[in-house]
Amino acid sequence: MNVKEHVISLPRRVFVGHDIIYDISIYFSQLGITSPFLIVTGTKYTKKIADRVIENLPKNAKYEVIEIDTATLDDVYKVEEVVKKVNPNILLGIGGGKVIDVTKYAAFRNNLEFVSIPTSPSHDGITSPFASIKGLQKPVSVKAKEPLAIIVDIEILSLSPRRLINAGIGDTIGKIIAVRDWRLAAKLRGEYYGDYTASLALMSAKHAFQCTKIINKDIKYGVRMLIEALISSGVAMGMAGSTRPASGSEHLFAHAVELLHPEGVLHGELVGLGTIIMAYLHGINWKIIRDRLKKIGFPVKAKDLGLSDEEVIKALTIAHTIRPERYTILGDRGLTWSSAEKIARVTKIID
């Protein structure tokens, strides 16, 4: 395949360590980052982290803060209103996946740089140049701005709710399926397949898989392993110029569930369930994946997430329609109701 131009979007610098939030002014100086800043953060816990960041900004820095709870197009518009008022040099996204997605999409739309400062390791959006924003035509990732820099404080991430940490593991293990789907599309549809980016995504999944052996014993070491996997996955997407290395049929299932059951379930949790199901379809040992996830307290049954059997089955039957241009193990026609029900029961997602 001849491509005239392939642009790789990657962060300029990644800072990972313990208590490094106190060194933010040093990092900003190294990168030539100056105020005014627009700080996008969440409420409650993430706002407390944002306050600590503010305390350690360069002396006399000018800034404005906006708090958001969701990742909708309306939230993006709210950020853009403040952008017009403040005219910031850079955006700082301090929070979980929703905050960072809104920040990077607003940065993209307004041609601004942004710094990613995650407060939880819930998914690989902390690095990637793509965002999941509700209110667009479909619940899939859209092009956004890659972070200029990422500042990851392991002490902070280790204190995030365990459910968010587990969701990050579920999201990353899903790359096992994404890469297999990509290979399948290359073989059957002649789609471009990047060996290096696929290998990087697969390595991230294997790293997260190893994390399931460690996280219960040593939370800080486990979180460090997980964050490295999440960063690698995001880098793979930046290199590929698409979400292909990190999003396959397991993500299509997750997006389908989000259409049917839009509240109360974490993206990474749905990807974890989708990974178990799609591993079965690919002929991978799904039982090992399920058992590893279960041992860390990951919800491996639909009812644990408040999902009905019908929602799971319906999601499986419509998953292939979410991104019809993205060929996966689900094929062009998807699964019939009876096939979807059988697979969901065999993999113990439903009883």
From Swiss-Prot:
It comes from the Archaea. The keyword Lipid biosynthesis applies. Catalyzes the NAD(P)H-dependent reduction of dihydroxyacetonephosphate (DHAP or glycerone phosphate) to glycerol 1-phosphate (G1P). The G1P thus generated is used as the glycerophosphate backbone of phospholipids in the cellular membranes of Archaea. Substrate binds at D124, D171, H255. Its EC number is 1.1.1.261. Belongs to the glycerol-1-phosphate dehydrogenase family. Pathway: Membrane lipid metabolism; glycerophospholipid metabolism. Zn(2+) binds at D171, H251, H267. It comes from Saccharolobus islandicus (strain L.S.2.15 / Lassen #1) (Sulfolobus islandicus). GO terms for cellular component: cytoplasm. It catalyses: sn-glycerol 1-phosphate + NAD(+) = dihydroxyacetone phosphate + NADH + H(+); sn-glycerol 1-phosphate + NADP(+) = dihydroxyacetone phosphate + NADPH + H(+). It is found in: Cytoplasm. NAD(+) binds at G97, K98, V99, I100, D101, T119, S120, P121, S122, S128. Keywords: Cytoplasm, Lipid biosynthesis, Lipid metabolism, Metal-binding, NAD, NADP, Oxidoreductase, Phospholipid biosynthesis, Phospholipid metabolism, Zinc. It is an enzyme of class 1 (oxidoreductase). It holds the Pfam family Fe-ADH_2. InterPro entries: G1P_dehydrogenase_arc, G1PDH, Glycerol_DH. Its main location: cytoplasm. Binds 1 zinc ion per subunit. This is Glycerol-1-phosphate dehydrogenase [NAD(P)+].
